[in-house]
Amino acid sequence: MSPMATDAPAPAATAPELLRNFCIIAHIDHGKSTLADRMLQLTGVVDARAMRAQYLDRMDIERERGITIKSQAVRMPWGYDGTDYALNMIDTPGHVDFTYEVSRSLAACEGAVLLVDAAQGIEAQTLANLYLAMENDLTIIPVLNKIDLPAAQPEKFAEELAKLIGCEPDDCLRVSGKTGVGVEPLLDQIVRQIPAPVGDADAPARAMIFDSVYDTYRGVVTYVRVIDGNLSPREKIVMMSTRATHELLEIGVSSPEPVPSKGLGVGEVGYLITGVKDVRQSKVGDTVTNAAKPSTKALGGYRDPKPMVFSGLYPIDGSDYPLLRDALDKLKLNDAALSYEPETSVALGFGFRIGFLGLLHLEIVRERLEREFNLDLISTAPSVPYEVTLEDKRVVEVTNPSEFPEGKIAEVREPVVRATVLAPSEFIGAVMELCQQRRGELQGMDYLSEDRVEMRYRLPLAEIVFDFFDQLKSRTRGYASLDYDVDGDQAADLVKVDVLLQGEQVDAFSQIVHREKAYGYGVMMAGKLKDLIPRQQFEVPIQAAIGARVIARENVRAIRKDVLAKCYGGDITRKRKLLEKQKEGKKRMKMVGRVEVPQEAFIAALSSDAAGDKAKDKNAKK
């Protein structure tokens, strides 16, 4: 075993039997980017001077939050038994929002390193990604990471892992990504256990896109895995889903900085540059083939990313609207799953209705808009797409509560998800109670070990998008983990709750909720706004209503001047006259007065926790 290959196989000339394509799959925070760093150092593709932590996570947000958002592919040389091999490592995102990206990255590999934190054990995303890997028939190498931690329990979790995969506990490799212990044996096992790629070198070229990123200077850089045939620079290629034709300006491998090559052969992983400026032209999961000798059959598994969570984003300063539009156009270049359309709100002005893959995606997009483009934004409460069937059989898709049709509705269907919750067994009751409150149905339950349990629920997506995850964490002292997967839709008894200020509807506060929860939502919103709206010269009623029926009401008391201050003693009729006069004035003011909702009230009322906490603080101070 040589720690580093002396003469690494050159791209385009590598025999498939010398290639090993693998990815690292793990739950968030189980240390896959750190392990990738050690591999880069050991194989010598990054020298010690240029090394920095989480080398492959390029975005500031990725580095700060410690999460991987975009997949990366790196070619590393490794010598084993006197033979030099080329290992292609694909670093995958670990978060549930990016499951489609993970599934495409897995389809580009023959094997997967299943990484589990030796201090925390198996988590929900570990399971989800493991099942994805099994669906793709990958060879799985179980690895326990962070064995240098004092809290590590490698023996206990090795047994859990072995039971899950069906291997011996001794087959689980012990590794520390931080110190580098056990990484060399892991690289040897990758060469030994993971099969070499198989493909027909003489067939028409077929390559699968598993990621694409936008580079300011070079346009879109597309990452591909060649399945059959080979690709060479300067030839014309076709994208099979869009039939768009491009010329290959450059082709090469990442090691981990881009290295141009003479082409890519069967089983190789690399990048293509065609000079295209829009990421939507090279869709993740699409098949690339040669234009002169095209393949007739595309690779399976491609689908368009479908937004699952919608939210309105509005600039706090209305004049920033064109800047927000430009910023979204730029982000879209790098994020093919982002969809948006302009919309206007009576309360918030001009903005955009944006579709996201999930809540993390929403947070990241919003944070990038605020940070990279210096925008101040308000986002409305996240909602999911509903399908409303009217009595005249028309079907309307509603992504914004204010578009919810009034009148004769035959049926409303909402998206549902299959959720997997992993938690210590002492918290079963707390988790079940939470899921039942959120209209969940228990589908099954398994004990992974005597103190860890896996619960499978079918839950409406709308119940998860708001604060389900926070609630789950707080009820289980942070030990539970959640993974979910879209599972069709179901009919539900849903209504739209409107919030009226002085009889006028405020569209930003409208929400679609289940009929049983409508009263609770109405009372909460009215109470929250009562604390947030400043007192006016006249009384302001805050009402929550379903259609024309008011279900909750609060009043913001009027500020009044003490008109009797100048009456020292005197007759009661004099006082009454002054009070009546004031009352008349207030009444007149109420008829013509308009309630201005301050910007802070919008922000606080639309963010679930901040407002509640503020209101609690106020009440506590009283």
Swiss-Prot record:
It is an enzyme of class 3 (hydrolase). Its main location: membrane. InterPro entries: EF-4 (IPR006297), EFG_III/V (IPR035647), EFG_V-like (IPR000640), EFTu-like_2 (IPR004161), G_TR_CS (IPR031157), LepA_C_sf (IPR038363), LepA_CTD (IPR013842), LepA_IV (IPR035654). NCBIfam families: lepA, small_GTP. Residues 17-198 form the tr-type G domain. PANTHER family: TRANSLATION FACTOR GUF1 HOMOLOG, CHLOROPLASTIC, TRANSLATION FACTOR GUF1-RELATED. GO terms for biological process: positive regulation of translation. GTP binds at D29, H30, G31, K32, S33, T34, N145, K146, I147, D148. Its EC number is 3.6.5.n1. It comes from the Bacteria. It is found in: Cell membrane. It comes from Kineococcus radiotolerans (strain ATCC BAA-149 / DSM 14245 / SRS30216). It catalyses: GTP + H2O = GDP + phosphate + H(+). Belongs to the TRAFAC class translation factor GTPase superfamily. Classic translation factor GTPase family. LepA subfamily. One of its GO terms (molecular function) is GTP binding. Keywords: Cell membrane, GTP-binding, Hydrolase, Membrane, Nucleotide-binding, Protein biosynthesis. It is a peripheral membrane protein. One of its GO terms (cellular component) is plasma membrane. This is Elongation factor 4. The keyword Protein biosynthesis applies. HAMAP family: LepA. Required for accurate and efficient protein synthesis under certain stress conditions. May act as a fidelity factor of the translation reaction, by catalyzing a one-codon backward translocation of tRNAs on improperly translocated ribosomes. Back-translocation proceeds from a post-translocation (POST) complex to a pre-translocation (PRE) complex, thus giving elongation factor G a second chance to translocate the tRNAs correctly. Binds to ribosomes in a GTP-dependent manner. The keyword Kinase does not apply.
